[in-house]
Amino acid sequence: MNHIRNFSIIAHIDHGKSTLADRLIQRCGGLADRDMEAQVLDSMDIEKERGITIKAQTAALQYKAKDGQVYNLNLIDTPGHVDFSYEVSRSLSACEGALLVVDASQGVEAQTVANCYTALELGVEVTAVLNKMDLPQADPENARAEIEDVIGIDASDAIPCSAKTGMGIEEILEAVVAKVPPPKGDPNGQLRAMIIDSWFDTYVGVVMLVRVVDGELKRGERFKMMASGAAYEANNLGVFTPADVPRDVLRAGEVGYIIAGIKELKAAKVGDTITLEKKLPNNLGPATEALPGFKEIKPQVFAGLYPTEASEYDQLRDALEKLQLNDSSLQFEPEVSQALGFGFRCGFLGLLHMEIVQERLEREFDQDLITTAPSVVYEVVKGDGEVIQVENPSKMPDAGRIEEVREPIVTVHLYMPQDYVGPVMTLANQKRGVQINMQYHGRQVMLTYEMPLGEIVLDFFDKLKSVSRGYASMDYEFKEYRASDVVKVDILLNGEKVDALSIIVHRSQATYRGRAVVAKMREIISRQMFDVAIQAAIGANIIARETVKAMRKNVLAKCYGGDITRKRKLLEKQKAGKKRMKQIGSVEVPQEAFLAILQVED
């Protein structure tokens, strides 16, 4: 036990934690040099392409320290993006120590702070590391000052390193051995292990990544999940060094995998405790108390996902279920839309999470999807005092039956160099933000705002990056529901409501957003044989209208000269025909129309 160290790496996006992990693995000989590729732990293609870590991955490394002892280091890589903060808290709860990696040329950024606080709350020992020291613009003194100033941990002995050139890697490993406490737990007690992650493998079923806290699990023993009571046999055990290495037993303090022929991802709930099924002569029997898990994560952003072909509904459901296996925060339920048919209402942690899920469905499962505009959950107090949660604009009751609508307010922390404070404040005010606080840390400024989540969901992050030339970073946490004057804007095509295009916006922006959506729709809907009226309405009030003019044949082409009445007769006849068509004709709404709502510029 004393020679085991469990640690993870926390950092803001692009501060180089995956590269650092590569170097640590290489130094400890976890992979042969020829298997060593950039970002070994980012195993999904989409992680490599976007250069972000989404799933937590692990590597068990053997390190011979300067004191001559061999230590087992379990490295758990964590994502840095705010949407995946639950992955971070999960990884950290399995560790005793964390390396806080800060880019020496950029200093502390928003998610670094958020993840670092998570670590400190969980009582993890945090060691600061200054990465990218090989860059000419690296400024270690400033970065140290910022770490002490913003996060409040001692950075005087922060380790300078460069994951690219390999400088400082030895020092980091020595620091892990010296500073990170060995795992607490009873190696001779009853088995208790926590599921840190689970994913589905087509050959062996569900693979569970566990951290053994007390006792040990041998191959072939039967174990049970404490939450559900379901029991399985441990067919295979092992550890990842990122490559998988089978073992006969997993002991207290180790992080490894269990394969037990489980078919359902739902059975292996992340955060659940595993213990032995029953008392046998050769074991200690089941534990009575489960380990404290982590809190269930609540989705913040909702959107509808629909298959382009109605017949692919079942495949989409299978795909979502498989994704949910290793992305426990994705939630979905079936829903029906008049415009789009059968599909699912999905809950995500944030916008990036939504994009990733969509992209994984398209790539890994070959799904063609239509996505509706993302919306957040509103609390609606009805006239009779009943409070309901509305996460889909089409479920919003009529204005007459509503007493008040409350929208979710979040506290947003924005970090940026002081040159960009002006534009960022303007942006935050446009989004109905209320400034709570402003602090200067050296050249960096931290602004704290309270803002409606609904404003952030659409495009706040992209706008923030563009007004600050990519320097600003943000993270947010939910604060409360507050009464607000929000209304539902419906889009009508030839007088018919298209439920999937409804949006919920603040009354002050309703007219503007309505006009913008309608104008955008006009460009997208192709011309028909009859006029198409596109309207935006609040209740029965029409607030904007555009018309897509009909295509028509030149019916007068065959008249040479001749009387005006003859021409008029032909035109009237054409008009009557168009009118008849309009009554029975239906308008196809192309996929772009649903995306148009997302791209309405402010």
UniProtKB/Swiss-Prot annotation:
The enzyme's E.C. designation: 3.6.5.n1
SMART domains noted in UniProt: EFG_C
Presence of the UniProt keyword Cell cycle in the record: no
Localization per record: Cell inner membrane
Membrane topology: Peripheral membrane protein
Entry GO MF terms: GTP binding; GTPase activity; guanosine tetraphosphate binding; ribosome binding; translation elongation factor activity
GO biological process: positive regulation of translation
Superkingdom as given in the UniProt entry: Bacteria
Annotated ranges, domain tr-type G: 2-184
UniProt function note: Required for accurate and efficient protein synthesis under certain stress conditions. May act as a fidelity factor of the translation reaction, by catalyzing a one-codon backward translocation of tRNAs on improperly translocated ribosomes. Back-translocation proceeds from a post-translocation (POST) complex to a pre-translocation (PRE) complex, thus giving elongation factor G a second chance to translocate the tRNAs correctly. Binds to ribosomes in a GTP-dependent manner.
Family matches, as NCBIfam families: lepA, small_GTP
UniProt-listed HAMAP family: LepA
UniProt-recorded name of the protein: Elongation factor 4
Taxonomic source organism: Delftia acidovorans (strain DSM 14801 / SPH-1)
